[in-house]
């Protein structure tokens, strides 16, 4: 039996003789010499044929079902192609429908041609021609839908290079010219034969040599240093035809550094190992014998040969290349060659030996030994060496100060070590076994500190984290320790009143002993204009009694200004309205560490009970200062007008800034009030916290130190609503509140400290939310002031940076320039502020440049190009003007917009902004035109009034004939002045003739005509 395996199928067959063997056996039996043998071979042959037929029928029946089942796959595989996958697996890949259609079309064409050929009549072919007519015989073919082909013809043109053919002489001439060009320009030459040979021309001892690149120059020591075939050798011989090749070298002239030099062996005096008599390529010397690079040497000899390479040049080349790659690209100066190159080499060697000491810079053992050394070993062995090198540089090369500084710092870093092992041991002994916090943090810090100079950056970060945990633990522990009960807290008012030197100076008091504000009175209007309301006495005081706050209400005693002559009724006014009573608690105190900060606490009596506020009587037009001590009454800066001012709801803390103004010098009052209005109040907003208010006071105290001892107005503490009330001159009808002890600005600033433990830091104080600056409104104000000298003068003095808003419109800028406002601003500020004078001068120059542009877009381009220059000139710090930050933001926006537009234009994008300046100019130009028309109208009216007055005065004394002549002269004069023709009496209508007293008729409209008639009418 025999077994055949097909995949997972196993077939068992009877042993049979193959057909070929049976035939061979039958032939052998039919030979003559075997005819007498028995007929046994016939039986064998028949048996073999029977077995073979049985086997073939069994095989066919076994595969028949499988072939029928796999017939669709075989049909599809007919058009598939074989591909090899990633790991060598070969498989079939299905073809696309387009490919199958192409194959079927090709088969159909071939079959049709074959049938046409077979079905055609027999004929003798005399000539062969192509019949374009379609044959009558059609072969059935599958229906194929032809799709249109969208193929773009390739525009690529095939370039056919002309073959270069040169004669031997031309080739020799060509190579000589290549050699001459390489020698003149110092270029490399590559000779490509069986192997590539690279060479270049070099000069040594005033002789020119051709030098090939040999393998030992790369650091290896091969047996063959260079391999040349015969063709390459001939070309190399032609390139080596130099002065050095023909030079007769004496003994010892071939020295190190000449590796790869091509010389004539016939001109060498030294003993040498010759490869041939045509060339000698220097490799080195072995046992006083020069060795050719082409000679084969043993491995032992290759290590013993003294190679004539130039390690110094290799080091120099590597150093130069690396230095050029790593050098600073951005420097603030132009680098020059000031230091001697040779001395630079000396110092570089000293630095190299100081950082990495070694016997040879190429020694691998020295490098490995240094890399295996610990930092302590390096410190012990080389710190003295570094100090010696530092002294050498100091004595011999003092001009290398930067190297000296580096060595000094490097030596100091190496010596950083912690030798206090006793402290480390004691800490470990005391708390080393304790793993809970904070002892775990202490142990970790102890382990890190003992490292000393070996601490890494990560160690420093870890030590800081553990130290922070210790600080947090200590802070929490300190807060949790109670040093005593709050019942023992006492904070009495000082028996001594605070002395305010500003209110005692005779130079600042008038004859009645009242404080004189001086220039401070004018600048204080910024507070009253924005943060105070004028009390209308005719409406009574009742509407001002209740003051609302975000957390409750407080009643003022302003109603007590109306007093009764009845003593009993008058005594009732001394009674206030009680608030909720609060005992002394933690909310009343402030601590820093374990100690109370008494000026930031509420006032108490001797027995520890809180000092509660009583009714505070009102006054008229006074500023009351002196919080916990005796109050001092100062007349308000606006008392002369007789009006009464009351703070708007929510901004009573402005009284604190008004009290600080008393201590401000008169020449600084303007800056102080503008700083408060423009910088601090917008940041504080409505109802700021006491911490924010104290921070603002600290900001002012830094700028104006004389305000530190300024007295505070009375401040009441409402613990129920958690609000501070700054009491003004109208007092307080609400009673029972606590009183803050802080009496000066310096004491109030303590609330700004983060280390102060106080709940009162978060209490609210009065404030105000001011409107943000509107650019469009300010530009309209600037336009309105162009032809109004009084408004322009106020703008120039109080808000000079408002002039910079003219850059938003070329028309506004030109109007400012033409009206003379910029010149006037320059003359005003030239003696007061050089920076503002420079800005106005720049605006004048910019207006002159804008006037040269013919279109609006060109004018805006001129302004945009100068926005960056204006921004750099304007933005020089903080200025006490409300318009300053608005001008800075405007210029900054224009600068950024210009830079981005330039980038877009460079990239080829269009900017839509070119259409917007026309809209802005259209919006602003009517304002300028209207102002100018009003000025012209006023001028016409004044001119008419003058002419009418003159005519009325002089015509009374004239004769009637002279009077008519005078009227004609006046008409002519008026037409010359106003540039408007006047109708003669002959041209007038009958109605106008009856009104012969009318001098001229303007043409500005019927309303203006009527007004002019009323102004210019007079009788003849």
UniProtKB/Swiss-Prot annotation:
Domain Peptidase S30: from-to ranges? 165-308
Matching entries from PROSITE patterns are given as: HC_PRO_CPD (PS51744), PV_P1_PRO (PS51871)
Q: What is known of its domains?
A: The N-terminus of helper component proteinase is involved in interaction with stylets. The central part is involved in interaction with virions and the C-terminus is involved in cell-to cell movement of the virus.
Q: Which residues form the Peptidase C6 domain?
A: 644-766
EC number(s) on record? 3.4.21.-, 3.4.22.45
Give the record's PTM text. Answer: Potyviral RNA is expressed as two polyproteins which undergo post-translational proteolytic processing. Genome polyprotein is processed by NIa-pro, P1 and HC-pro proteinases resulting in the production of at least ten individual proteins. P3N-PIPO is cleaved by P1 and HC-pro proteinases resulting in the production of three individual proteins. The P1 proteinase and the HC-pro cleave only their respective C-termini autocatalytically.
Q: Where is the motif (Involved in virions binding and aphid transmission)? A: 618-620
Q: Name one GO cellular component term.
A: host cell plasmodesma
Member of which family?
Belongs to the potyviridae P3N-PIPO polyprotein family.
Instruction: Locate the site labelled Cleavage.
Output: 308-309, 766-767
InterPro entries tied to this protein: HC-pro, HC_PRO_CPD_dom, HC_PRO_CPD_sf, Pept_S30_P1_potyvir, Potyvirid-P3
Q: Where is the active site?
A: 216 (for p1 proteinase activity), 225 (for p1 proteinase activity), 259 (for p1 proteinase activity), 652 (for helper component proteinase activity), 725 (for helper component proteinase activity)
KW Transport (keyword) present: yes
Species in which this protein is naturally found: Plum pox potyvirus (isolate NAT) (PPV)
What the entry lists under Gene3D superfamilies is as follows: Helper component proteinase (3.90.70.150)
Chain segments annotated as coiled-coil in the UniProt record = none
Motif window: Involved in interaction with stylet and aphid transmission: 360-363
Q: Hydrolase among the record's keywords?
A: yes
User: What protein am I looking at?
Assistant: P3N-PIPO polyprotein
The record's Gene Ontology biological-process terms are: proteolysis; symbiont-mediated suppression of host innate immune response; transport of virus in host, cell to cell; viral translational frameshifting
* Recorded GO MF terms: cysteine-type endopeptidase activity; serine-type peptidase activity
